[in-house]
Design a protein with these regions (language model features):
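Bacterial N-terminal signal peptides that target proteins for export
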Residues: 1-7
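Beta-propeller folds
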Residues: 8-9, 18-460, 464-465, 481-483, ...
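Intrinsic structural disorder/low-complexity segments
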Residues: 7, 23-24, 685, 721
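N-terminal signal peptide c-region/cleavage motif recognized by signal peptidases
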Residues: 14-16
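Serine-hydrolase catalytic core recognition
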Residues: 241-245, 297-301, 306, 437-755
Length: 755
């Protein structure tokens, strides 16, 4: 009896304590569900990425500046931070700059305010003044005096203005001619006179900026280190075909004419000149050794002793010569060496010079991008880095200690880290700690660097590190509290074997409350183009949230990088050589087959989605395979003869030299084999992959009796940018996905891989 009473009392005590613990336990917050409006609606969009600080520029070894933003992402001021003291100050008086700009005729008060709060500035070499283009003229603003001085006053637009290395002159392009102006006296000098509609001096056309010098980079002149001369490209556009792009929205319709060389068509004729900055006759650097050949000049720079060094490739880019020439009349260039591979060669940037006159050079000759050291005469000294990984970015070298700093993939191809290595190749050390993706901005002495980091679940964060990798301070934690308020599923990174044993990287996002005994539909995103990874342990913003939205609807999200897009060296990208689509499709099929083998996939409800090369790949897959029940193809290339010379011929050669490859790689010629439901999307004024591609494909599908859907977005180029149109497009895509993946599926018996 006593034992029973004690036992009952004990039970009562335990029950009471348990109840108290339940009552005092904090309530787990209810997570919100993502909606399409949260991600894409301009009126209801939520800021998930936070407001990461960016645009950092080192002023010297101890101070850097950046456009500091508030919690809403609005620029507050151009701030300077001293890393030695931790103190901050404004780089200049923003109110004074605004007031000075407002005095310029034609500039409103609102425009003056906006122009005084920019995300990037055109700085002088000493960082004490900036160039501004106001009312189509160039001005220089001096931080110390607060004076805004006009440098030009001629009619016409001035483009691509830059300071000389000594800061005393400014070069610019007007009317496709090259000019300089003296900062102190405002004396203007015209360096070329033959520029016009068909002759471009110091400025690039569409195809050169898009495919060689980088999207948005139009400047094609370069100051010599001593500020005495400029080297510049001249492009003769007379052989290039014009392509018209109509804008149907204006009442009278606007028609844009674009210089666009399609594969196999004539390229612009390129020449390289030098000219004295104070005026004189431009001198052509002779390339007579390539007489009769169609070549490209893909990089130009100067050596430390004021010689011109440039890279030249043949049209199909199977070799690249590094040439050097004196900056004088009738100079004959010397070829330091020729790069070649078993497929194509791409420029990897200019040489980085050492004090002893040697230079560092990036090359993919081994199948992986690595560092090499050369003497100034082109004699190879050594290969500095090697292995089945890549150097992605060469940041520079600390000559005092002979440390080379770079970013690369030695730890992980899906991420990226910052490294250093001795000039002799020894002492390789990873400087970045956390797994994910890192990039770096080093100070001039290479004693410290700003580290930008993110991973697939975490928006960008910024820290200051010493050159040995130890952290000095967190610059911007960017905690993004909004992101934690929503129900998100942790992505899984997996590796998948292709049929020949190649290891592919993939990312998988399963629905919340995933049940492996159930069957789920699959949405697969791809790009597939050479060197264009999609499986990355890095923050991808709205793309990541789009994936999460689909997962929350009960759909498995699958991203699998085929070998040519894997980032695993040029040797993997070369699989696409002469045949776009073939190897990519086999790899994508093998990835999907692996996913289906896990037992939780409904093979009758699978979809492929992509834009640009990914749009091509979707169109190609649905006309060459039956493994996907549906596809969304955006900005698709339907016939590779329609795309530009430089990108296409690099991989496919000229159509005249590879007719079967072009035909077999172009979806329009396989339209009769369309399998599954297809949605085509395209920008009406796309100046990259022209709307013509979709129209040609649609025409072939119609003639073959194939039903499909398509949507054209007016005033949109190679990608839809207008927020209202983006919301419309994503809504259309979501409806198409719901219909095909969450509705009735097709018979899995028809899903067979290609041969």
């Amino acid at each position: 009896m006593i034992r029973r009473t004690l036992f009952a009392a004990a039970l009562l005590t335990v029950a009471t304590l348990s109840a108290q613990q339940v009552q005092t336990q904090p309530t787990k917050p209810t997570l919100r569900e993502l909606t399409l409006e949260n991600i894409f609606d301009p009126k209801a969009k939520v800021t998930f990425t936070g407001t990461p600080q960016s645009g950092f520029i080192w002023l010297d070894d101890h101070t850097y500046t950046w456009p500091r933003t508030d919690a809403e992402g609005k620029i507050v001021e151009q701030t300077v931070l001293d890393t030695a003291t931790g103190k901050t100050r404004p780089l200049f008086d923003g109110a004074k700059l605004q007031a000075a700009i407002a005095k310029v005729p034609g500039i409103s008060a609102d425009e003056a305010k906006s122009m005084s709060l920019q995300r990037s500035w055109n700085f002088s070499p000493n960082r004490r003044s900036i160039l501004l283009t106001l009312s189509n003229d160039i001005f220089v603003y001096d931080f110390d005096s607060g004076a805004l001085n006009r440098l030009t006053s001629a009619p016409g637009d001035e483009e691509e203005a830059t300071f000389s290395p000594d800061g005393r002159s400014v070069a610019f392009v007007r009317g496709n001619n090259l000019y300089t102006v003296d900062v102190a006296t405002q004396r203007e000098r015209q360096l070329t006179t033959d520029g016009g509609e068909n002759t471009l001096n110091g400025i690039l056309d569409w195809v050169y900026q898009e495919e060689i010098y980088g999207r948005g980079t139009f400047r094609s002149y370069w100051w010599s280190p001593d500020s005495a001369r400029l080297a510049f490209l001249q492009l003769d556009e007379r052989p290039v075909h014009r392509f018209t792009i109509p804008d149907h929205i204006p009442y009278r319709q606007n028609v844009e004419e674009e210089l666009y060389p399609k594969a196999g068509d004539p390229n612009p004729i390129v020449k390289l000149f030098t000219v004295v900055a104070s005026g004189g006759t431009p001198r052509e650097i002779s390339n007579e050794q390539y007489s009769g050949a169609d070549f490209l000049i893909v990089n130009v720079d100067w050596t430390p002793d004021n010689k011109v060094i440039y890279q030249l490739t043949n049209r199909e880019q199977t070799w690249l010569d590094l040439n050097v020439a004196e900056a004088k009349a009738n100079a004959t260039p010397k070829t330091l060496f020729r790069e070649s591979t078993k497929a194509w060669v791409e420029t990897q940037g200019n040489p980085v010079w050492l004090k002893d006159g040697s230079f560092l050079w990036l090359s993919e000759r081994s199948g992986f991008k690595h560092l090499y050291q050369y003497k100034s005469d082109g004699t190879l000294i050594r290969q500095v880095t090697n292995g089945p990984w890549e150097v992605r970015t060469l940041h520079g070298i600390d000559p005092a200690n002979e440390w080379i700093y770079f970013s690369g993939t030695e730890r992980s191809v899906t991420g990226g880290d910052v490294y250093r290595v001795k000039l002799d190749g020894s002492g390789l050390k990873r400087l970045s700690d956390r797994a994910g993706s890192h990039s770096a901005n080093f100070n001039p002495a290479f004693s410290q660097f700003i580290d930008f980091w993110s991973d697939v679940e975490t928006p960008p964060q910024v820290s200051l590190l010493r050159n040995d990798g130890t952290q000095v301070k967190v610059i911007d934690a960017n905690e993004s509290p909004t992101l934690r308020q929503y129900r998100l599923v942790k992505p899984e990174f997996v590796q998948v074997k292709a049929r020949d044993g190649f290891t592919m990287e993939a990312m998988l996002i399963k629905p919340p409350d995933f049940d492996p005994s159930k069957k789920y539909p699959v949405y697969e995103f791809t790009y597939s183009g050479p060197h264009a990874q999609q499986v990355r342990n890095a923050w991808s913003g709205r793309s990541y949230l789009w994936y999460q939205l689909l997962a929350n609807r009960g759909i498995i999200v699958w991203v699998c990088d085929n070998r040519s897009a894997s980032g695993k060296g040029a040797e993997s990208a070369w699989a696409a050589y002469k045949n776009f689509g073939t190897t990519e499709l086999r790899d994508l099929e093998d990835g999907l087959k692996w996913l289906e083998s896990q037992g939780y996939v409904d093979s009758s409800r699978t979809m492929l989605d992509g834009w640009s090369y990914g749009g091509f790949m979707t169109s190609y897959a649905l006309t060459h395979s039956t493994m996907w029940a549906a596809g969304i193809s955006g900005g698709t290339v339907s016939d590779w003869r329609d795309y530009d010379t430089i990108y296409t011929e690099r991989v496919m050669l000229m159509p005249q030299n590879n007719p079967d490859g072009y035909k077999n790689s172009s979806p329009r010629f396989a339209a009769k084999n369309l399998h599954g439901n297809l949605l085509l999307l395209h920008g009406a004024i796309d100046d990259n992959v022209h709307l013509q591609n979709m129209v040609q494909f649609a025409y072939e599908l119609q003639k073959a009796g194939k039903q499909f859907r398509m949507m054209i977005y007016p005033k949109s180029r190679h990608g839809v940018g207008d927020p209202a149109l983006v919301a419309h497009m994503r809504g259309l895509m979501l409806s198409f996905i719901d219909e095909n993946l969450l509705g009735r599926g097709r018979s899995p018996a028809t899903a067979q891989p290609s041969e």
